[in-house]
Amino acid sequence: MRGSVMFEYALEVHEEPGSVWLSCAEIPEMHAAGDTLEEALDGAIDAMETALSIYVDDRRLIPTGDAGEQESDAVLRLPALTAAKVGLWNTLLESGVSKAELARRLGVQRPQVDRLVDFLHHSKIENVERALQQLGRRILLSVEAA
């Protein structure tokens, strides 16, 4: 796919007696743990979304993940909404458009734009898509065999 971003992150599995924890070299702020690998993986999305929030708070670009290029113990694929929010956040930073300006273009209040890049808030993907369109971007979605 031309110019596509995968939003797949290579995870390292660390095992200790009675527990497992996960880390991600691309997003070092991400850590998930559990009694088993399955439990740790179950919490990995929440842990990743919390870690991505740190990038927004610090006004940093978010690495977009390309696990296919790396050796890894496990792979974390972002949900569609989370991936769209990463795309929106990175586009805002790269374009230099402020949240206030995006709010003006969308005809909404600034707090609504804040929520569009808040990984802990469940936005409607249509609203993220509309914001991306205002920035000259679009969402591409593909479905493939697991």
Swiss-Prot record:
InterPro entries: TTHA1013/TTHA0281-like. It comes from the Bacteria. SUPFAM superfamilies: TTHA1013/TTHA0281-like. One of its GO terms (molecular function) is DNA binding. Gene3D superfamilies: 3.30.160.250. Keywords: DNA-binding, Repressor, Stress response, Toxin-antitoxin system, Transcription, Transcription regulation. Belongs to the HicB antitoxin family. Antitoxin component of a type II toxin-antitoxin (TA) system. Functions as an mRNA interferase antitoxin preventing effects of the HicA toxin. Probably forms a complex with the probable mRNA interferase HicA; when complexed with HicA inhibits the toxin activity. This is Antitoxin HicB. It comes from Pseudomonas fluorescens (strain Pf0-1). The lineage of its organism: Bacteria, Pseudomonadati, Pseudomonadota, Gammaproteobacteria, Pseudomonadales.
